[in-house]
Design a protein with these regions (language model features):
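Signature for phosphate-centric chemistry
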Residues: 24-155, 159-327, 331-423
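N-terminal signal peptide c-region/cleavage motif recognized by signal peptidases
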Residues: 18-22
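Bacterial N-terminal signal peptides that target proteins for export
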Residues: 1-10
Length: 423
């Protein structure tokens, strides 16, 4: 093994160890904050960390970004009605317990609120992107300054899905409110889908990865206690109790995304059941969108066009070919997770094959909650012109398996990324 490979390997072990320690706290976190069990459906939670000071003499001049759309309604009516059908049947037979009637009432309210809004960005999703935009603006005011005649051009692009377009609009709206002098362009066009939405491997792998994820659900979920707490003995028999348990969990998970915590019913589950449900959803996301040894290679590789665009656009700005202050991109979890995994960020680098080990080293709510984002902040030395890059995942420093962090030398970062894109 050459020296560079050895350094990268050792760095990867450090990243994996750090991720393991962080993920091991999941059960404690869920006990204190049951809404975090929602994983990929967890609404965005700003959790600031201690920041390393910017090296002396360096000033921010450009930001590159990829963000998932904000909190939304469930994408289909089936995700609301699936757990309600057996509850309704039992209610008609007067075979629900008091807890069962309460859960049904809350579920019906969530379903009614979502009617005609499936997949839509919620108001909470709008506010998430406005808040992220404001923190970005206030953290790096030099980037968005128009003082002394400086031009600030923000280029934004999104996928063709309305919730992504509206997330882009909310983000830009807040930036313009903070500085009306910003010049912004916003596009949603098929022209950019080759890198904003390039994940064909997931469709090809879908049946196999979903089958493995379903086998995990069958092994880990034990619905007997839950079912007995909701239904009396007179209730019609459930066709698939495990599916019912998971569907019910999916329904309560979305309450936070539409600003209706009063309609959540996490208390219907024990802490052990919530942990099992979180672990099941976590494994599903890992196998279908993440860097698993079994399915991850083509999924992670699908993010290469996006990373190439990020690096090439940054090079054009650094070399003076383009006068951009920020490049903002808006898409989905199925694109952001492979990007984070391709970069081998500290929260998403773990590559394992054993399902039982996933929960100890990978937590989807830390990788891609609603409005998840990866930011690349570029700094230039005022005297020498040297450029450094800081990488943030969900507004926290992302440790990469290369030297020089958290303010990575541009050439080191560029060579690292180009290597990832060429493999």
């Amino acid at each position: 093994m050459n020296v560079r490979s050895l350094k990268t390997g050792l760095s990867a072990l450090v990243v994996l160890a750090a991720g393991s320690v962080a993920a091991q706290t999941a059960s404690e976190e869920i006990a204190a904050h049951p809404e975090r069990s929602a994983g990929v459906y967890h609404s965005y939670e700003y959790l600031p960390s201690e920041e390393a000071p910017v090296p002396k003499g360096y000033r921010p001049f450009y930001i590159s970004h990829y963000g998932r759309h904000g909190s939304r309604y469930h994408s289909s009516g089936d995700l609301y009605t699936a757990p309600l059908v057996p509850l309704r049947a039992a209610a008609a037979a007067d075979a629900l317990t008091p807890l069962g009637r309460e859960v049904l009432a809350k579920g019906e309210a969530l379903a009614a609120d979502a009617a005609g809004r499936y997949g839509d960005l919620s108001q909470r999703g709008v506010e998430e992107h406005r808040a992220i935009a404001e923190r970005m603006f206030r953290s790096w005011p030099e980037v968005f300054s128009t003082r002394r005649g400086r031009e600030c051009l923000v280029e934004s692009r999104s996928t063709l899905v309305p919730r992504c377009i509206l997330s882009m609009a909310a983000f830009n709206e807040r930036l313009k409110e903070l500085n009306p002098g910003i010049r912004a362009t916003r596009e949603s066009s098929a022209r950019y889908m080759d890198y904003l939405a390039g994940v064909p491997a997931m469709g090809e792998l879908g049946p196999r990865s979903h089958a493995v994820a379903d086998s995990v659900k069958r092994a880990w979920l034990h619905p007997e206690r839950l079912v007995a707490s909701l239904f009396t003995e007179a209730a019609p028999e459930l066709a698939d109790p495990q599916k019912f348990m998971y569907d019910l969990f999916m329904l309560t998970s979305i309450a936070q995304d539409v600003s209706r915590p009063d309609l959540a019913f996490y208390d219907a589950f024990t802490s052990e059941e919530l942990n099992a449900l979180w672990a099941t959803l976590n494994a599903y996301c890992y196998y279908t969108m993440g860097p698993s040894r079994r399915f991850g290679d083509p999924i992670v590789a699908s993010a290469r066009p996006l990373l190439r665009n990020i690096v090439e656009t940054a090079r054009e700005v650094i070399d003076g070919e383009r006068n951009l202050s920020a490049s903002l991109r808006f898409g989905h979890d199925v694109y952001l997770i492979p990007l984070a995994s391709l970069l081998q960020t500290s929260v998403s680098a773990a590559r394992i094959s054993d399902a039982d080990s996933i929960r100890s080293c990978w937590s989807i709510e830390k990788v891609s909650p609603m409005a998840a984002n990866i930011q690349f902040i570029f700094f230039r030395h005022e005297r020498t012109g040297d450029v450094r890059v800081r990488v943030l995942c969900n507004e926290r420093d992302a440790q990469l398996p290369i030297d020089g962090g958290p303010y990575y030398p541009w050439e080191t970062f560029r060579i690292y990324c180009e290597g990832l894109c060429a493999e």
